[in-house]
UniProtKB/Swiss-Prot annotation:
Transmembrane segments: none annotated. Belongs to the RbsD / FucU family. FucU mutarotase subfamily. Involved in the anomeric conversion of L-fucose. It catalyses: alpha-L-fucose = beta-L-fucose. Disulfide bonds: none annotated. One of its GO terms (biological process) is L-fucose metabolic process. It is found in: Cytoplasm. This is L-fucose mutarotase. InterPro entries: L-fucose_mutarotase (IPR023751), RbsD-like_sf (IPR023750), RbsD/FucU_mutarotase (IPR050443), RbsD_FucU (IPR007721). Its EC number is 5.1.3.29. The active site is at H22 (proton donor). Homodecamer. It comes from Haemophilus influenzae (strain ATCC 51907 / DSM 11121 / KW20 / Rd).
Length: 144
């Protein structure tokens, strides 16, 4: 156990976050996401919602400042419903953890899957909200 590290962060997830370089992306996926068929580097965070993971990760994580939107979510498929509270919950978690909210954009479902395949890792959470997936892009960590 380390002091100052959120208990939702497993050793495997901490190691992954530390290994990521600027421009790398990590997917925080809901419990329904086809992580194992899309990616070889899958980390389990069963029972932990994505807003809790965002609260835990974002204080340790610099968002990419060189892109328009370092946050990406999946658009609802036409004719399907999307709970707008999911996006709000995620942005509130980030705001609470770091004091600001980076820009967010949404991708079509299969574009999101393509992007997820290129990510550094996929974290499968206990999130049960439909379309509850988010990709976060790491930026350059400032030198202390």
């Amino acid at each position: 156990m380390l002091k100052g590290i959120h208990p939702a962060l497993s050793p495997e997830l901490l190691k992954t976050l530390a290994e990521m370089g600027h421009g790398d992306e990590i997917v925080l996926a809901d419990a329904h996401f086809p992580a194992h068929s899309l990616h070889k580097n899958v980390i389990r965070a069963d029972g932990i919602s994505i807003d809790i993971l965002l609260e835990a990760i974002t204080p340790l994580f610099e968002f990419d400042a060189y892109v328009d939107a370092p946050l990406l979510m999946m658009k609802a498929v036409e004719g399907d419903s999307l709970d707008p509270n999911v996006e709000t919950r995620y942005l509130n978690a980030i705001e609470s953890a770091v004091g600001f909210t980076p820009n967010l954009t949404c991708l079509e479902r299969f574009d999101f899957y393509t992007r997820a395949k290129q990510a550094y890792a996929v974290v499968v959470s206990g999130e049960i909200a439909k379309y509850g997936n988010i990709i976060i892009k790491k930026g350059v960590t400032p030198i202390l």
